[in-house]
Amino acid sequence: FLPILINLIHKGLL
């Protein structure tokens, strides 16, 4: 998992 994808997912959830 890339940090960028995780960041986008977190922004989406938040």
Swiss-Prot record:
Keywords: Amidation, Amphibian defense peptide, Antibiotic, Antimicrobial, Fungicide, Secreted. One of its GO terms (cellular component) is extracellular region. It comes from the Eukaryota. Its main location: secreted. The modification Leucine amide is found at L14. Expressed by the skin glands. One of its GO terms (biological process) is defense response to bacterium. It is found in: Secreted. Antibacterial activity against Gram-positive bacterium S.aureus. Weak activity against Gram-negative bacterium E.coli and C.albicans. Belongs to the frog skin active peptide (FSAP) family. Temporin subfamily. This is Temporin-1Lc.
